[in-house]
Amino acid sequence: MMSGRTDEELKGVTLLGNQSVKYQYQYNPDILESFGNKHPENDYFVKLNFPEFTSLCPKTGQPDFAAIYISYVPDKLLVESKSLKLYLFSFRNQGDFHEDCINIIMKDLIRLMDPKYIEVWGKFTPRGGISIDPYCNHGKKGTKWETMAEKRIQWHDMNPENINNR
């Protein structure tokens, strides 16, 4: 098979192509895997969309559903997408508020990859007639990405979308 990556470069990628992987429904950040960025000199965004996120309300135990949007500018590492999918599924029985889930996801990805810039946005379906859409971001300290994060949070959602009850 043709590959632009060597076996050495792929040795940390263990979940992709592994058909015997079991889904975990308890929060587990150790599922996350990364691989090397072949283009660290380039600034580029990677956007990952996960429309089937579920977690539990920490008070009532009722399920919460959301679409999660992750955008990041990689530095030396990228997140492997199957591990990200399994990681996000691991929130299934996690009791946390929407805002907590989004911040936990961002912090876990920062620990994994140390990206130049990252933002995570959750668009949760309404409960009690209110939809909650938390957003968080982070730019690497002492770089232009720190400034970008400050600007993005200041200007976040200045042109809100029409809400149609999703």
Curated annotation (Swiss-Prot):
Q: Which UniProt keywords apply?
A: Cytoplasm, NADP, Oxidoreductase, Queuosine biosynthesis
Pfam families assigned to the protein according to its UniProt record, in alphabetical order:
QueF
Q: Please state what class of enzyme this protein is.
A: oxidoreductase
Q: Which InterPro entries match?
A: GTP-CH-I_C/QueF, NADPH_dep_7-cyano-7-deazaG_red, QueF, QueF_type1
| Similarity comment text for this entry | Belongs to the GTP cyclohydrolase I family. QueF type 1 subfamily.
Q: Which NCBIfam families match?
A: QueF-II
Per the entry, what this protein does is: Catalyzes the NADPH-dependent reduction of 7-cyano-7-deazaguanine (preQ0) to 7-aminomethyl-7-deazaguanine (preQ1).
Q: What is this protein called?
A: NADPH-dependent 7-cyano-7-deazaguanine reductase
Organism, as annotated: Alkaliphilus metalliredigens (strain QYMF)
